[in-house]
């Protein structure tokens, strides 16, 4: 076992072993064949030394579904983790698998009925580059090889003066930035980072602390609360080669303008769908240039409360256009989502409309892409063998709130992550009931630009 692998000891079973190795650049395609008895075989294709590499078949195919999950390496997409479900009925085997990349989450492939055990292959700050496992008539075991993710380096913007410095990109996040200004422009900038284990690192200062200046209030980023630094706008004076102003934006808030933004050449550091995790640049008596290290923003799975029959997972999309559900007798029976993917609507239906009596249909429409679904609040009640959802309330990024749809009960749940949009749902249901509801969230640019101002100091 390589030190770059992550062992899945809980389901390592006897059977013919296979090992694709770890000398690959990336995973490109994963093929699965199976049925209600489990995943029968798996085939993984890779990129090695920049060229496609077809992987061998592992297992045996006796018919059933065939599904392929493709990873677009040309768009810098890579495989982050694999989740799955396994059982020991008629010998242990894997019943269902789900893939997560840095850009999206697949639906559950296979059958994930109630009572299956769950496993996960993931290593923070790493991507999957190879697999090994065991398979006979079914896929019995799965393990992965990992390698660290390399952040993207954005070139420094600003003047040509000063001494080069580089904090690197091997951080988990930026947590605080503080600036001091003087009559020349930005005198110094200080950064606080946390490492991959979540521990604070030594503060980094670039520029000069000597002479007259004015230290501004620090700009703090609450990474533990899913706040991320998305971009920095600035300007620099071409004659002096000194950065004059900076303005910071997260998915939750935007700072005031730090310095004088009325003169100089403007620049922006940042890339859509990415967060800034490190900096480099040049400085001497003042800050002359600033560059950044960026990495892809992370999707967050908001787990559901409750339990029930079949587990389902729609995966993730660009946004949600409409939610519809059917209820009667004070119980939500069926829920339907209209998602947006590549500009087209894709509909997913979970639950069923079996039962007695007439059904009431409720709908909530979102003005995507001008509006995002940001919160779902629901109520549920206990029921023998599980839980039953009774009502749902929706909120959007435009501060719209739906009425309570359904019949509220006394137990509540909330699907929300501040500064994030809900881009997919998962849960548990049967042909008669919706038992539980969870979601996926993704950071969005702050829509509230009010209150932005500039700090100017006269000398």
UniProtKB/Swiss-Prot annotation:
* Record has Aminoacyl-tRNA synthetase as a keyword: no
* MF (Gene Ontology): carbohydrate binding
**Claim: Secreted is one of the keywords in the record:** no
Identify the SUPFAM superfamilies for this entry.
Answer: Mannose-binding lectins
Gene3D superfamilies (alphabetical): Jacalin-like lectin domain
Name under which the protein is recorded: Jacalin-related lectin 12
What Pfam families would the database entry show? Jacalin
* The organism's place on the tree of life at top rank: Eukaryota
InterPro entries on file: Jacalin-like_lectin_dom (IPR001229), Jacalin-like_lectin_dom_plant (IPR033734), Jacalin-like_lectin_dom_sf (IPR036404)
Q: Which residues form the Jacalin-type lectin domain?
A: 2-148, 151-296, 298-443
Keyword line? Lectin, Repeat
Family statement: Belongs to the jacalin lectin family.
